């Protein structure tokens, strides 16, 4: 199966966008999952709901909210451009942001479930033996949560690969800049004679998703085996 240059461009851009989206959202995913599991504070239920909103909102709505907040004239985007010269709307950076926002709830949910399975008594025992909060987190909590972190990361990566609605609303469908696999397929489907190209990208998407899930299962199994030793 031979891809054309524009198709390769879409595949490579999708991999770049998905990888960066996961890379930048992972620290926040771990933090918010830990916050929801280990802390009690006013507004916790509200925070939980806000974090999971992208799962239930139409992607176009999320893209519109990003556009009005992070666009050149948005209340956040305008300041980012004036102070740092950074723009998100209609650029690959915006595609990364849209993918990160849409995939974030899946990441948080997987990590949260793993954290809920960690025995709090292990952390308490380490604290009574003199270990500090950060040392307990990095030597006990994080290693025991690693399988969930891996699963959440791969799920977020796979979700980012398939992101379309928020992306096309926020950053449009610019070849070489924001045209990811779903956007390229959308264009090809609407183009006479583009069915074969859309089919090739469809096969690539399925293959990437399957590979991601298989790698996730393999890494999670290795992590569980090491944690059980």
UniProtKB/Swiss-Prot annotation:
The chain crosses the membrane at residues 17-37, 50-70, 84-104, 137-157, 202-222. PANTHER family: MOLYBDENUM TRANSPORT SYSTEM PERMEASE PROTEIN MODB. The keyword ATP-binding does not apply. PROSITE patterns: ABC_TM1. Residues 1-16, 71-83, 158-201 are periplasmic. Keywords: Cell inner membrane, Cell membrane, Membrane, Molybdenum, Transmembrane, Transmembrane helix, Transport. Residues 11-219 form the ABC transmembrane type-1 domain. It is found in: Cell inner membrane. GO terms for molecular function: molybdate ion transmembrane transporter activity. Part of the binding-protein-dependent transport system for molybdenum; probably responsible for the translocation of the substrate across the membrane. The keyword Protein biosynthesis does not apply. GO terms for biological process: molybdate ion transport; tungstate ion transport. Pfam families: BPD_transp_1 (PF00528). It is a multi-pass membrane protein. InterPro entries: MetI-like, MetI-like_sf, ModB_ABC. This is Molybdenum transport system permease protein ModB. One of its GO terms (cellular component) is plasma membrane. Belongs to the binding-protein-dependent transport system permease family. CysTW subfamily. Residues 38-49, 105-136, 223-229 are cytoplasmic. It comes from the Bacteria. Gene3D superfamilies: MetI-like.
């Amino acid at each position: 199966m031979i891809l054309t240059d524009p198709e390769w461009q879409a595949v490579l851009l999708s991999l770049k966008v998905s990888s960066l989206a996961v890379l930048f959202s992972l620290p926040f995913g771990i933090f918010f999952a830990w916050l929801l599991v280990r802390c009690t504070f006013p507004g916790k239920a509200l925070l939980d709901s806000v974090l999971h909103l992208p799962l239930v909102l139409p992607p176009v709505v999320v893209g519109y909210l990003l556009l009005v907040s992070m666009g050149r004239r948005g209340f956040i985007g305008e300041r980012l451009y004036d102070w740092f010269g950074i723009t998100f709307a209609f650029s690959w950076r915006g595609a990364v942001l849209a993918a990160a926002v849409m995939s974030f709830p899946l990441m948080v949910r997987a990590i949260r479930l793993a954290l809920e399975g960690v025995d709090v008594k292990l952390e308490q025992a380490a604290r009574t033996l003199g270990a500090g909060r950060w040392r307990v987190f990095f030597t006990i909590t994080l290693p025991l949560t690693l399988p969930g972190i891996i699963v959440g990361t791969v799920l977020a990566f796979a979700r980012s690969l398939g992101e379309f609605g928020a992306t096309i609303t926020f950053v449009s469908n610019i070849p070489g800049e924001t045209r990811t696999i779903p956007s390229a397929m959308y264009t090809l489907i609407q183009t006479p004679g583009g069915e074969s190209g859309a089919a090739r990208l469809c096969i690539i998407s399925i293959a990437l998703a399957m590979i991601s899930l298989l790698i996730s299962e393999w890494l999670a199994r290795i992590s569980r085996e090491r944690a059980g030793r």
